[in-house]
């Protein structure tokens, strides 16, 4: 991330400041003690292997036990330093239920025992993997953590090489092991409510238990990919309750976990036909809650990616359930502030719908125009991108239904003073299929878009936009020169009328101002004749304005 370097630099400066202040104190307090503390030797496991040297687990120095009074009153210099320091986001752990008995014994590998003992050994290793460790303290249970990691890796190797070794009797133990390790309450979000995560600046909060967690996910995925998987037996354990708990985890801030969850849920959707309708309905409810209640959920992009592949497999004609999902769920998702975080996935799903059934084109385009951003230029560029993607798969007959509202919106975007919005709208005319549709309907389109093109060609501040507008005007001139001249003449006449109306309006306001000044000066005399004369002039002016 771009911001991480600046974060580390600012943090380093604060640490250097603290070190320099501590050096003076240490010289006074330790001048009488010239001996150095002996270095701690790394701890070893019962087999004699060194654990303290591993990078994943760090040792924590022991506290001396002495109470030292500390002055916590901040000085002015401390306040200045704290204002300029931006802390680096640390790894966080979910609220795991830590196992009480964490003393594990290393079991032999599957390659070291006969094949007829693999089943019992797999059960023992699965039981070991149900032990949950505390990764918030990296100095505890180092040996047990390593034993569990090896057991998970052995199970992965077994199911990868000998898929038939995992029989139906192991299904409950496998699902239980996955549930114990994965299903847990997630920590509160790092960002305050309503704040959108910046992918370039913000560091995601990573799960500290990932050394074990990713192996659990990997094993479970390989379990689903096994050709010997009996879904009729497994569906007893992979049920609706399991799916609900799995969907909750999509709110994890760790992108690595969300990626595993996406693949896991997709495998379940493909394997368990009886759960498909429930999965779609549950995702719909989650989206509705996101759109209409809190707009706080981290896994929208991953869920939309799953739905993109599901939409791709819809049979024709589309069911009413799928059309309702499009109109009430997928299109309203565009109004969320966090649209940039899941834009590629939702755009793919929308295009898939239009490509599957062209009859939904009008509803999709009008829905996007309804939620069109008014003040967010970067979001408006995304909408323009999506509209062009839809046009590329649009039937010419459907284009006729939406061309008028669409080109009114394009004219507004072309007139935008934000050069990125104007540039993106003008790039539509580099699309050959779009130009072909314009050529066939130029008599309707040109009168709508010509005023915006003409005004921008005369007044836009950006030279690139000015050049692109001139190219578009030349394109229309080449398509139909006579129509172009006619529209130009009509627009020139309308501009002349507006100028005349503006002159008349200014003259009338001048008359009103003069009457007001005259009235203010003469009302003091309270002359009834003057007041009557002023009233008559105002009535005459009102009649002239009404008659045009």
Curated annotation (Swiss-Prot):
A Gene Ontology BP annotation from the UniProt entry: deactivation of mitotic spindle assembly checkpoint
Modified residues (Phosphotyrosine): 96
Function: The B regulatory subunit might modulate substrate selectivity and catalytic activity, and might also direct the localization of the catalytic enzyme to a particular subcellular compartment. Has a role in cell shape control and septum formation.
Source lineage: Eukaryota, Fungi, Dikarya, Ascomycota, Taphrinomycotina
Pfam families linked: B56 (PF01603)
Name by which UniProt lists this protein: Serine/threonine-protein phosphatase 2A 56 kDa regulatory subunit delta 1 isoform
Cellular component annotations (GO), alphabetically ordered: cell division site; chromosome, centromeric region; cytoplasm; cytosol; inner kinetochore; meiotic spindle; mitotic actomyosin contractile ring; mitotic spindle pole body
PANTHER family: SERINE/THREONINE PROTEIN PHOSPHATASE 2A PP2A REGULATORY SUBUNIT B, SERINE_THREONINE-PROTEIN PHOSPHATASE 2A 56 KDA REGULATORY SUBUNIT DELTA 1 ISOFORM
Species in which this protein is naturally found: Schizosaccharomyces pombe (strain 972 / ATCC 24843) (Fission yeast)
Coiled coil regions, renumbered to chain: none
């Amino acid at each position: 991330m771009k911001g991480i370097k600046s974060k580390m630099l600012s943090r380093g400066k604060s640490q250097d400041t603290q070190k320099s202040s501590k050096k003076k104190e240490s010289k006074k307090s330790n001048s009488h003690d010239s001996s150095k503390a002996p270095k701690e030797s790394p701890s070893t496991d019962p087999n004699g292997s060194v654990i303290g040297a591993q990078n994943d687990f760090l040792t924590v120095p022991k506290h001396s036990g002495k109470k030292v009074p500390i002055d916590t009153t901040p000085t002015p210099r401390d306040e200045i330093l704290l204002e300029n320091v931006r802390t680096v986001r640390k790894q966080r752990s979910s609220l795991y239920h830590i196992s009480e008995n964490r003393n594990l014994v290393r079991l032999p590998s599957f390659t070291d025992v006969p094949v007829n003992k693999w089943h019992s050994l797999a059960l023992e290793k699965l039981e070991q993997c149900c032990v949950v460790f505390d990764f918030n303290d990296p100095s505890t249970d180092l040996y047990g953590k390593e034993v569990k990691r090896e057991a998970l890796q052995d199970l992965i190797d077994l199911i990868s090489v000998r898929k038939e070794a995992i029989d139906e009797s192991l299904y409950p133990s496998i699902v239980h092991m996955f549930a114990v390790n994965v299903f847990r309450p997630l920590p509160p979000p790092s960002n305050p409510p309503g704040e959108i995560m910046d992918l370039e600046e913000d560091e995601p909060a990573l799960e500290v238990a990932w050394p074990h967690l990713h192996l659990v996910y990997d094993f479970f995925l390989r379990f689903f990919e096994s050709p010997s998987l009996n879904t009729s037996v497994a569906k007893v354990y992979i049920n609706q309750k399991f799916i609900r708990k799995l969907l909750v985890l999509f709110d994890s801030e760790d992108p690595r976990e969300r990626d595993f969850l996406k693949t896991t849920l997709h495998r379940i959707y493909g394997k368990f036909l009886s759960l498909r309708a429930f999965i779609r309905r549950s995702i719909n409810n989650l989206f509705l809650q996101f759109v209409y209640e809190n707009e706080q959920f981290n896994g929208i992009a991953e869920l939309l990616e799953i739905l993109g592949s599901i939409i791709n497999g819809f049979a024709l004609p589309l069911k009413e359930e799928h059309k309702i999902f499009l109109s009430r769920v997928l299109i309203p998702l565009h109004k969320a502030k966090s649209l940039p975080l899941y834009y590629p996935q939702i755009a793919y799903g929308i295009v898939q719908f239009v490509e599957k059934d062209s009859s939904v084109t009008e509803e999709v385009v009008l829905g996007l125009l309804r939620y069109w951003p008014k003040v967010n230029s970067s979001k408006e560029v995304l909408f323009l991108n999506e509209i062009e993607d839809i046009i590329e798969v649009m039937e010419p007959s459907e284009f006729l239904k939406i061309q008028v509202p669409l080109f009114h919106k394009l004219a507004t975007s072309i007139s935008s003073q934000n050069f990125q919005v104007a540039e993106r709208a003008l790039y539509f005319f580099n699309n050959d299929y779009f130009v072909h549709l314009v050529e066939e309907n130029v008599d309707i389109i040109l009168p709508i878009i010509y005023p915006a093109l003409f005004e921008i060609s005369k007044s836009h501040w950006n030279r690139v936009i000015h050049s692109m507008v001139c190219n578009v005007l030349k394109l229309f001139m080449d398509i139909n020169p006579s129509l172009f001249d006619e529209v130009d003449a009509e627009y020139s006449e309308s501009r002349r009328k507006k100028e005349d109306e503006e002159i008349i309006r200014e003259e009338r306001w001048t008359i009103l101002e003069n009457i007001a000044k005259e009235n203010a000066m003469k009302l003091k005399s309270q002359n009834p004749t003057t007041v009557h004369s002023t009233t008559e002039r105002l009535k005459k002016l009102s009649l002239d304005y009404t008659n045009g």
